[in-house]
Amino acid sequence: MTPEERSRLEALDTALRSNSVREHIRSVVVRVREQLARRKDALMSWEPFPLDVLATTLPPEIRSAWVFVLRAGADTGAERHPNSHQRMMSFEGSGDLQTGEPGRWQSNVLVSDPDAPLERRWVSIRTNVWHRPVIDASADWAVVSFHTVPAEELIEERPDDSREAGTRQMKYLGK
């Protein structure tokens, strides 16, 4: 991790440490977890939240913030964001946010302990880097993600052998 990227993650980490911010995020986690519980076939559910909830200055490239809840025991499969650099923090529970590409995954086990080192709680995923969350079977995993595009522009791309391009794309808010 470069010193510049560490500085960005530290700024985001600081923004998430206040009690009022954590309470707001917990309320979003509750809603998103309820959505996931209603959708028995879904592996994850999500909701963006306004950046102005964070009472501190964010790195200027941050354009959206999200809460994702990933189902216990799930492997959501490979995905990447062709238009955004993602920075993600484990908020509740734990999981392995693997990066790389199919057949050559690199493990990044993340925990939600606020006293754990930054590298054990955060991962930085550059634009177009394949990643896949693998969630522990004992509990759902709630994460906070920051992206470099506005919420309505965030694209998820997944492998799809049935398409000429070999992938399919969708916007998270278009689902």
Can you say where each PLM-predicted feature lies in the sequence?
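Short, compositionally biased strand/turn segments
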Residues: 42-48, 52, 93-110
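A short, N-terminal "cap"/entry segment at the start of jelly-roll beta-barrel domains
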Residues: 1-62, 114-115, 175
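Double-stranded beta-helix
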Residues: 101-118, 130-175
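Conserved short histidine dyad/triad with adjacent acidic residue
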Residues: 64-86, 125-127
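Short, hydrophobic/aromatic-rich beta-strand segments within well-structured domains
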Residues: 68, 88-89, 144-145
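Glycine- and acidic-residue-biased ligand/ion/polar-headgroup-sensing regions
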Residues: 72, 82-103
